């Protein structure tokens, strides 16, 4: 006696509940795109006064004089780039090291708890990081780290000037601490996607543990690691509260990392409520538009790089 195979029948797409469901889901998806377009439109329309007044010169001059309505965003762009790049210099080696340890060398009993605590750092509010930086990091820098750097490397100009603790160096360090969970988490997921037979094949050729990690794992995951780094950069570019509390908030371009600075996000947080003139307000909104577009581009590039490695595959653990 053979079982009769009954073909599955496709539900009618004309039924009212199905149409309502599909319409609701489609609306949810399109609403995100609509919100993105609406944000860009609103920022562009409200920054048009500044754009017509200063043009591209707005991004190439360092004047910031609300009284005389002369505005230039260069100090804020400089502060954003310097603090973010400094954060990457500090955070990338630490993040990759954490990811390699948790995926390749950490005992299985500790792998889960360690990964949890690393990711827990990303859930801490930025204002808490800022408070910690004010009461712990800044005194440490002003009393010990910056005087040492000034004595040994002051001739470079990067570590010269008064050692107050507040400045670009403090902002870069606190940003580095904040982006470590992002970079390490993405890197760990990418490393776990590398097939186990890739590791075994390299070891079978007589490679050491370090050579296996360097050649068999890191080399195959470098695009995804780069994506995680760029994703961390996107977080650093847009970070506001913690940076505002320790960077000094002075619109200047200084060579020394000890000097106070300003970032694009910080100037928006500090001065938006004080902007009384239309041109002043429009200039701040134009800075916000530039920061928004840069962040979108950076994050999109990061997601693309991560996707080239994972190809949509879920991360796989290995023994």
Language-model segments: residues:
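Interhelical loop and adjacent transmembrane-helix boundary motif
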Residues: 243-292
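Membrane-cytosol interface at the C-terminal ends of specific transmembrane alpha-helices
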Residues: 96-101, 111, 115, 153, ...
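Periplasmic/extracellular loop-to-transmembrane helix junction in inner-membrane transport proteins
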Residues: 6-24, 43-87, 107-108, 161, ...
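Transmembrane-helix boundary motif in ABC transporter permease subunits
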Residues: 87-118, 302-311
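Membrane-interfacial helix termini and adjacent extracytoplasmic/periplasmic loops
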Residues: 52-71, 129-177
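Transmembrane alpha-helix signature in integral membrane proteins
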Residues: 74-101, 229, 291
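C-terminal transmembrane helix and the adjacent membrane-cytosol boundary/short C-terminal tail
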Residues: 188-192, 196, 273-319
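Transmembrane alpha-helices
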Residues: 116, 120, 124, 128, ...
């Amino acid at each position: 006696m053979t079982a009769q195979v009954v073909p599955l029948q496709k539900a009618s797409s004309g039924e009212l509940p199905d149409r309502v469901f599909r319409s609701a889901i489609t609306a949810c998806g399109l609403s995100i795109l609509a919100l993105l377009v609406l944000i860009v439109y609103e920022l562009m329309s409200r920054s048009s006064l500044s754009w017509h007044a200063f043009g591209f010169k707005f991004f190439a001059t360092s004047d910031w004089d609300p009284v005389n309505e002369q505005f230039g965003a260069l100090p804020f762009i400089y502060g954003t780039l310097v603090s973010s790049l400094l954060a990457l210099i500090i955070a990338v080696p630490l993040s990759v090291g954490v990811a390699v340890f948790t995926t390749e060398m950490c005992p299985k009993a500790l792998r889960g708890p360690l990964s949890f605590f690393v990711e827990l750092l990303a859930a801490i509010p930025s204002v808490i990081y800022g408070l910690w930086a004010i009461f712990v990091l800044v005194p440490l820098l002003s009393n010990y780290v910056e005087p040492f750097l000034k004595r040994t490397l002051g001739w470079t100009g990067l570590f010269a000037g008064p050692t107050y603790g507040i400045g670009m160096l403090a902002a870069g360090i606190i940003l580095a601490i904040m982006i470590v969970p992002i970079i390490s988490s993405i890197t760990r997921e990418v490393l776990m996607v590398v097939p186990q037979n890739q590791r075994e094949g390299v070891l079978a050729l007589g490679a050491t543990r370090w050579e296996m990690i360097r050649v068999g794992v890191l080399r195959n995951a470098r695009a995804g690691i780069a994506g995680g780094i760029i994703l961390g950069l996107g977080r650093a570019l847009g970070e506001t509260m913690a940076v505002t509390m320790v960077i000094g908030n002075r619109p200047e371009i200084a060579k020394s990392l000890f000097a106070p600075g300003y970032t694009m996000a910080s100037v928006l947080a500090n001065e938006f409520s004080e902007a009384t003139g239309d041109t002043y307000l429009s200039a701040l909104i134009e800075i916000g538009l530039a920061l928004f577009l840069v962040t979108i581009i950076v994050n999109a590039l990061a997601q693309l790089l991560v996707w080239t490695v994972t190809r949509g595959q879920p991360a796989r653990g290995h023994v």
